[in-house]
């Protein structure tokens, strides 16, 4: 790495990146700790109260599970989980559908009850309104007929009055001529 690159790295506060192809220190160091070689907790020198057979019995279920898992690559477990998931989803949809159906029925029943209540309360009011409208229409026709009759009577009275005025005027004219 050049001097300039080193200065840039110091200024930016970043650490130098190690290239992937370079061997790590573990390969150079022969004493590197391999987790598979040494257990995290050493039981040999600690004076364990359990015997070796107890330890072996404790490891057997874990090893058996590991072999089962490695044996079928987890596809059986995944298929079981997938099947369970599908069943859960289908059950959720069924319960959701049932809930929606019950809500829909409840709303329909509520609407039907409101409609019957409305018809009960306002049906008679509507019927009375129709009767009043018919009565009003009949009265309108009657008053229209009476108004026409009164107009005819007034028209004849006006004509009679005009004739009487004309006759009175003619009499006055003849009387004035005579006198």
Curated annotation (Swiss-Prot):
Major subcellular location class: nucleus
Disulfide bonds: none
Comp. bias (Low complexity): 42-53
InterPro entries: XLR/SYCP3, XLR/SYCP3/FAM9_dom
Cellular location(s): Nucleus; Chromosome
Annotated signal peptide: none
Feature: compositional bias, Basic and acidic residues: 1-11, 56-75
Tissues/organs with expression: Expressed in testis (at protein level). Also expressed in ovary. Not detected in other tissues tested.
Entry keyword set: Chromosome, Coiled coil, Nucleus
GO cellular component, one term: nucleus
Stretch list, region Disordered: 1-75
Coiled coil: 146-175
One Pfam family linked to the record: Cor1
Family: Belongs to the XLR/SYCP3 family.
The protein's name: X-linked lymphocyte-regulated protein 5C
Organism of this sequence: Mus musculus
